[in-house]
A protein has these predicted regions:
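GST-like domain detector, emphasizing the conserved glutathione-binding G-site
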Residues: 2-171
Length: 171
């Protein structure tokens, strides 16, 4: 657990993370590991094992929150919500008590990325799914996360959950 004396309070990197006059360019190189029913990538679907980190300010993250709710995965997949702002380093849990995610014990999502990849060179994006035993990011591939909720987490879908990715409609 972090204490006030060990937490970073340097907010000097707050502010815009895009250059004035330039469009936001989302990092599209994702951590593409998958959480699957059979665990073929080393990450099996297990109730209570993972935490979805999704900021409401991010449209890519909102689709995972919507899918989770529609499918009834609330009891098997917890959610951490960073605040609506992002500094140059990472999304922060500034809205949580003490500025720390209550489950992970992290003040920045970046810590989950570095727990798995100490020299992670890319953008720290949401949504991200974090493995709770290791507190390390598993994936941040927003498109695949949503598809996997629909196709790999079916054992945990609520009764009457919609089929969000019908086999007949797949390419």
């Amino acid at each position: 657990m972090t204490t006030e004396s060990t937490r970073s309070t340097d907010h000097s990197t707050r502010g815009a993370y895009v250059a004035v006059g330039e469009a936001f360019d989302r990092d599209m190189n994702y951590i593409d590991d998958r959480i699957t029913a059979d665990g073929r990538d080393g990450w099996p679907v297990e109730a209570g094992r993972y935490r979805l980190i999704a900021a409401r300010a991010c449209p890519w993250a909102n689709r995972t929150l919507i899918s989770r709710r529609l499918l009834g995965l609330e009891d098997v997949l917890s959610v951490g919500m960073p605040g609506p702002t992002h500094d140059r380093r990472s999304w922060t849990f500034d809205l949580d008590e003490g500025g720390v995610d209550p489950v992970l014990g992290y003040e920045r999502l970046q810590q989950a990325y570095f727990a798995r990849f100490p020299d992670y060179p890319r953008g720290i994006t949401v949504p991200a799914v974090v493995d709770l035993p290791t507190k390390a990011v598993v994936t941040n591939d927003f498109q695949q996360i949503t598809l996997d909720f629909a196709t790999e987490w079916t054992e945990h879908h609520r009764e009457g959950a919609p089929d969000l990715y019908p086999a007949a409609q797949r390419e």
